[in-house]
C-alpha cells in the first residue's frame, strides 16, 4: 500500500515539473532565456482555482490556466522580444509580479491574501468525488494525463514540423534565419506563448491537486524546472525525464516527512540540493542553443 501511495505522490509532484520544463524547452529553443517558469506556475494555479470555483468545471479550470500562461507568455514576448529588454530581467520581474499580483487578487476576490476557498469535490469538479485510493486521487487530475501527451507532442513539434524547425533556427542562427525570410520575432513570440500555456498547466496541477490556491504555492518548482531543462540539454523528452526524477525526490520528501525520521527543513532542501549538484556535474556537457540570451 505504501508503494501505491508513493506512486500517487510521484505522479502529483512530477506533473507540474514536467509541464513547466516543456514550457522552458520551447521558449529557450527559440533563443530566449526563460526564468519566468515560477510565474507561469503561480498564474496557472491561480487561474485554475478561480475558474474552478466560478464554474465548477475542471475543464474550464484547465483551459483558464492555459490561457493565463499564454497571456503571460505574450507579455514576456512584448518586453523581451519586441522591446529587446533583457530576458533575464523580464523573467525575474514577471516572477515578482506574479507573487505580488496573486496575493493582491486573493485579497480582492476572497478577502484573504494567503489562500482561496476550497474547490468543490463534486462529480462536476473532479472525475470522482471521493478518491478511494491516493493513486485514484492523483489520476483524477487531468493534467497528470496531459503531461506525457505533451512531452510527445513537443518532441514532434520541434523535430517534425516547419514551426519547430523555425524555432530551432531562431535559437541557433537568428541572423541566418532572418536572411532566409523567417520572421524571427514572430516565431519567438509563438514559442513563448506556447511555452507559457504549457508551463501554466503545471500550475493547474498544483491548484487542482491541493483543491485551493495558496500564496506562493509554486515553492521554487519553476527553478527546478529550469534545472531540468539544462539537465535535459534542451530536449523535451530528456527534460521531462529529469523533471520526473526531481518530482520523485519531492515525493520522497513527503514520504519521509510523514515518518518523522528526518528534520523537515532538511527534506525541503533535498530536491534543490541534489538538483544543484546534478546541474554542476553536467553543466560542462550541456550545449545550449547558440543564440540563447
List PLM regions with ranges.
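Membrane-interfacial amphipathic/re-entrant helices at transmembrane-helix boundaries
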Residues: 1-20, 33, 47, 55-61
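Inter-helical junctions in multi-pass inner-membrane proteins, predominant
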Residues: 5-9, 158, 195-227, 257-263
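Hydrophobic alpha-helical segments embedded in the membrane of multi-pass proteins
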Residues: 14-22, 39-46, 67-74, 171, ...
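Short, non-helical or kinked segments that cap or interrupt transmembrane helices
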Residues: 25-44, 81-94, 211-223, 236-241, ...
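Alpha-helical transmembrane segments within multi-pass membrane transporters and channels
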Residues: 56-103, 245, 250
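Transmembrane helix-bundle core of multi-pass membrane transporters
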Residues: 98-160, 263-268, 286, 291-293
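Helix-loop-helix "hairpin" substructures at the membrane interface of multi-pass membrane proteins
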Residues: 136-213, 236-241
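Cytosolic-side transmembrane-helix boundaries in multi-pass membrane proteins
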Residues: 154, 172, 176-186, 253-293
Amino acid at each position: 500500500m505504501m508503494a501505491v501511495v508513493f506512486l500517487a505522490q510521484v505522479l502529483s509532484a512530477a506533473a507540474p515539473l514536467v509541464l513547466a520544463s516543456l514550457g522552458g524547452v520551447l521558449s529557450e529553443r527559440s533563443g530566449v532565456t526563460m526564468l519566468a517558469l515560477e510565474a507561469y506556475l503561480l498564474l496557472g494555479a491561480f487561474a485554475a482555482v478561480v475558474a474552478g470555483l466560478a464554474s465548477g468545471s475542471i475543464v474550464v479550470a484547465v483551459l483558464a490556466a492555459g490561457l493565463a500562461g499564454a497571456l503571460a507568455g505574450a507579455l514576456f514576448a512584448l518586453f523581451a522580444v519586441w522591446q529587446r529588454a533583457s530576458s533575464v530581467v523580464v523573467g525575474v520581474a514577471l516572477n515578482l509580479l506574479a507573487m505580488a499580483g496573486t496575493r493582491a487578487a486573493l485579497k480582492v476576490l476572497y478577502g484573504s491574501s494567503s489562500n482561496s476557498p476550497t474547490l468543490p469535490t463534486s462529480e462536476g469538479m473532479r472525475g470522482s468525488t471521493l478518491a478511494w485510493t491516493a493513486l485514484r486521487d492523483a489520476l483524477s487530475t487531468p493534467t497528470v494525463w496531459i503531461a506525457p501527451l505533451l512531452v510527445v507532442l513537443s518532441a514532434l513539434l520541434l523535430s517534425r514540423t516547419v514551426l519547430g524547425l523555425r524555432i530551432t533556427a531562431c535559437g541557433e542562427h537568428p541572423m541566418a534565419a532572418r536572411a532566409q525570410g523567417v520572421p524571427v520575432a514572430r516565431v519567438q513570440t509563438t514559442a513563448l506563448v506556447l511555452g507559457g500555456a504549457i508551463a501554466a498547466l503545471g500550475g493547474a496541477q498544483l491548484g487542482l491537486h491541493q483543491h485551493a490556491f495558496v500564496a506562493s504555492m509554486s515553492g521554487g518548482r519553476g527553478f527546478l524546472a529550469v534545472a531540468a531543462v539544462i539537465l535535459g540539454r534542451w530536449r523535451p523528452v530528456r527534460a521531462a525525464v529529469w523533471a520526473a526524477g526531481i518530482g520523485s525526490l519531492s515525493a520522497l520528501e513527503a514520504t519521509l516527512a510523514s515518518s518523522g525520521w528526518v528534520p523537515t527543513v532538511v527534506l525541503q532542501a533535498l530536491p534543490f540540493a541534489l538538483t544543484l549538484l546534478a546541474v554542476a556535474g553536467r553543466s560542462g556537457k550541456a550545449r545550449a542553443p547558440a543564440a540563447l540570451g
